[in-house]
Amino acid sequence: VWSRTPRRGATWNRFCSNDTAVVYLRDGELICRAIATPQRLKGQEPKDFISGGIKSEGKFSFQYGRAEARIFTKPHNGNFPAFWMMPQDGSAGWPKAGEIDIWEQINTENVSYHTLHSHWTYTLKHKQNPTSAVQSHNIDYSRYHTFAVEWTPTLISWYVDGEFVGSAPKSTDSDVLANGQWPYTKPFYLILNQSVGDGSWAASPDPNFVYETRFDWVRVYQTKAQNPTLTAIARNVIAPLSPSQNDEDADDAVHKASLWYDLSGRRINNFNQGHGIVVNGEGQKMLLPAH
C-alpha cells in the first residue's frame, strides 16, 4: 500500500530521503523524521537535511468517505509535518488538480491546520469565498491526537479527536466552479510525512534538533451510500478483526450485516481470528496500518 516519498522541488519534499534514519517502523508505529544529514552520508548526500515520508500513490486511493490517523508530533521552530491527500490523476497540475490537507502543524504552535488547495483558492486567492481552510487551537501536542477528514461530493469537513472543527463547501456559483473551486471529484491518495520549513510559512530548520512525527495508525471508511470506490485491496493491508460466523450457520440478519473478505477482496465462508476487511450494515470499512 505504501512507498516512500521521493525528493522533489517543493518545500515539503525538498529533503526527502529513503534513508532508514528518517522513515522506519518502531513499536508498530511509522516514524518520520527530519534531521541534519548524518556524517556517514556526507559526500553522497547533497542536502544539509534529510526527511522522510510515505504515500499510497498508485497503490491505494479513494473517492469520498472518511480518512483519519492517530498522530504525535514534536513542536519546535521549523517543524512542518502533515497528513494529507493528493489526486491519483494529477495531470491537471498543482493546484488545479486539488489538494486536501487533513492536518498540518508548524513551528511551536498549538494549532492544527486543515486546508483545501485549488486553482480558485491558491492561484486566484479566493480563500474565503467560500471557506477553504479551518483551524483548531489549544492543541496539547504533548500527547497523541486523531485527525480526520470527511469528504462528500459537496462538503469537506475536519475533526480533531472526534470533535468537529469546520467545513469547506462546494460552491453553488457556476462561475466559481468554472474557475476550479472544486476539483475534489476524483480518487485521492494519502501522504504521511515529516518536513521542515524554509522560512516562508514554517521557519527554517534547526540543525541541532531531531524533528519527529509518529503515525500510530491510518484508517479509511466509506458508506454504502457513497458507493465505495476504494481502488486497491492489497495483500499487505492488515487489520485485526474479530471472528465471524460460518456463512452456512449465520442467522440471515447477521449474514447481511457482517460479510467478510480476504485481503484480495474475495468472499470467504469460514473466517477465524486474523486479518481482513469488513463490510457491515453501516457500509464498507477498510483499515490501513501505517506500515
Where are the model-predicted features located?
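C-terminal outer-membrane/trafficking sorting elements
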Residues: 236-291
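GH16 jelly-roll
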Residues: 1-230, 234-237
